[in-house]
Amino acid sequence: MMGVDRTVDVRGGAVADNESQGSETVAVGLAPQAGSAADAPADTLADALAEVGSSPVTSDEGTGPARRRRRSSGRWAIVLAVLVLLFALPWWTLFSAGTDWPLPVVVVSAVVFAAALLAFPVLIVRGHGSRRLDRSSRIADTILGVVWVLFAWSVLSLLLRLALFLSGVGDPAGPRIVSVAVAVVAAGLLAWGHHEAMRLPRVLRLDVTLPRLGRGLDGTRVVVLADTHYGPIDRSGWSARVAEAVNELDADVVCHAGDIADGTLDQRRGQAAPLGTMRSRLAKVYVTGNHEYHGEAQGWLDHMAELGWESLHNRHLVVERGGDRLVLAGVDDVTAESSALTGHRANLVGALAGADPELPVLLVAHQPKYVGQAAGGGIDLQISGHTHGGQIWPFNFLVRLDQPVVHGLSRHGERTQLYTSRGTGFWGPPFRIFAPSEITLLTLRSA
């Protein structure tokens, strides 16, 4: 049946009527509003290293140069202590701890681990700091992934041996066997994890029932992308395949929940280009993630608009299908306020200004932790990313300390549901272990 797509943009006052196959879409563009936000901690140790010593210090009463130096020294001490532990425990498990390896093996391994430990902070700062050197990033990210997996399995091996010892079983396996087992398991997981990170994400399909959704919107198909993180590894071909997969899903709405890329817009323009080929019947919407605020947040908002996406920069659209309407709202990431960019902060009140309170609302907010505000504002469904599902097990347990949910559909309060994507790409270490990437197809159902 032929219909009329109608788009109204309050910002420019333009009205365009186009004969097309589909339903009516009404887009209401609101100017960014000011609001409140809370700072989020650095995603990983790598982020902390890239930022430590370079973050501005707010001058308040009683804060002088000596106190600022003490704070900076304290941060460095914590970061360096964590680094030493991350590198030292795997070396001790693999090459010391009574393994009785020949002395040359012990010495060479110590030199290799020490060199990696000393080089890692330099590479991180060169790669993820202001210089943004891709080669340094690739090396540092790979080192971080390898060391994290070795560290995790070294801890597990020590805990298992301790449990056996305390239970009176003794040590059924010699230290050398344990070290070989840790190395083999880690190598296997890293090989598999690299494949998981680089492959085309699988499509995860899920029905979500929204009691306030009109029957005309029943069956609305919402494709969710998040955390593509185009970065120092050129994934232009992967990006094109993701776009093809999205187009095959015949979506009504496509959402990108932030963290498009790491690096400058000029560095990642080619990898992001396939985003412009994605199709939807009603809308393609995007919000900023925390990584946009490590670089060019406003630049990415403008570029996504050039690629045909609606940037929900504390604003909303209203889409109509089958005579029923749905509000698509979005807010900046919660770290936006600390970026000092004018008009950038998470502001749900501004995003919903002028929206009919009787209509159901789908909110896109990068971090799951924003669901507290969403539930308080009566949001029906929040879509988020950020967590990567932990990306490399067992990092998911650390993520859970900062976020209410790591992955999946959850309920918060009487009305609000939250869907948290594990992400479409990966950040930093090119590995995904027990946290597969996804392209999500949410089918909205009326009660």
Regions flagged by a language model, labelled:
Residues 209-447:
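Soluble catalytic domains of enzymes that build or remodel membrane lipids, polysaccharides, and related
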Residues 176-180, 187-212, 232-237, 295:
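Hydrophobic alpha-helical transmembrane segments in integral membrane proteins
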